[in-house]
Regions:
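N-terminal accessory/interface modules of nucleic-acid-binding and processing proteins
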Residues: 1-293
Length: 293
């Protein structure tokens, strides 16, 4: 029995060591995530780099994109091992990838709990195999662009009208709660301007957000529109992120993360709606040219 007692004790020690290792790994990843959020929301260059990376990876949360960037600043297009395999690509030997947080549901004492576990993603540069399906690029005067604009109109929380006399490309009026778009714009300019103003209208939320001002919400609206345009290959000016440090100044890391996460979710909703409008068959199958969680 002494031998069995020793084996049991050894197993208990291994279990304790494994739990301690996992706890330390989670704490280390949590600190890395916090540091990444603080960096992105403090430095204009880092924030713009985040927008470019998030635009290519719409199905990953902002937290996970920033976390992956912190481990490899040069990432572009990331996926899990399983998704890369499904796309006909294999991860190169000796590549460890980047750690991210993956939602995890588990049962304990007969109750369901929601938490997260540590997963890994790999950049396309860490893989080899079949060429990926090229991302869709919206062009002026095409059925795809018409479908995208139609979906944007459906997504607008307020009425959209046109004007041939306005000097701006588009503007949301919080007083009338409507968006006016210049009728002199080409399709791609309409796409960029309308998506930006839809975000303004969404933030105002029919007046339920009483603190709305165009100046305060400009960077958020421009950021979402920029990511959407980048995702669909539509030319758009870079947002003015020079004040990013001031915008987030005084905010705790969790609040900063919440703001960036909310922008990603807004972008993802618009991106997904447009993608499905353009490619209805993707309602029945996973996206092939976009990253998956």
């Amino acid at each position: 029995m002494a031998k069995l007692d020793d084996l049991i004790q050894q197993k208990q020690q291994r279990d304790e060591d494994w739990k301690a290792k996992k706890t330390a790994e989670r704490e280390e990843l949590g600190q890395l995530s916090d540091d990444a959020v603080m960096h992105v929301t403090s430095e204009p260059g880092a924030y713009l780099h985040y927008l470019d990376t998030q635009a290519i990876n719409p199905r990953y949360s902002a937290s996970n994109v920033m976390l992956a960037m912190a481990q490899n600043p040069d990432i572009t297009y990331i996926n899990s091992l399983e998704v890369w395999n499904r796309l006909g690509r294999s991860v190169n030997r000796d590549e460890n990838g980047m750690k991210i947080r993956v939602s995890d549901t588990y049962m304990k004492d007969g109750r369901e709990y929601h938490g997260y576990k540590i997963g890994r993603v790999f950049d396309i540069s860490q893989t080899h195999g079949k060429a990926g399906v090229p991302a869709l690029s919206l062009k002026d005067n095409t059925p795809e662009m018409d479908a995208a604009l139609r979906r944007l109109l459906d997504s607008s929380p307020v009425p959209v009208v046109t004007s041939s006399t306005m000097y701006q490309d588009a503007v949301y009026d919080p007083k009338t709660q409507s968006i006016t778009v210049s009728s002199r714009l080409i399709d791609s300019k309409i796409f960029a301007a309308l998506s930006r103003e839809i975000v303004h209208a969404g933030i105002h939320d029919h007046g339920r957000y009483p603190y709305y001002t165009r100046e305060d919400c400009a960077m958020d609206a421009e950021s979402v529109s920029y990511m959407l345009c980048r995702n669909f290959g539509v030319e758009a000016p870079q947002p003015d992120v020079s004040r990013v440090g001031q915008v987030f100044d005084g905010m705790e890391v969790q609040d900063r993360r919440g703001v960036v996460d909310s922008l990603q979710k807004y972008f993802r909703k618009l991106q997904n709606d447009i993608q499905r409008e353009i490619s209805p068959q993707e309602r029945k199958q996973p996206e092939q040219n976009r990253p998956a969680r």
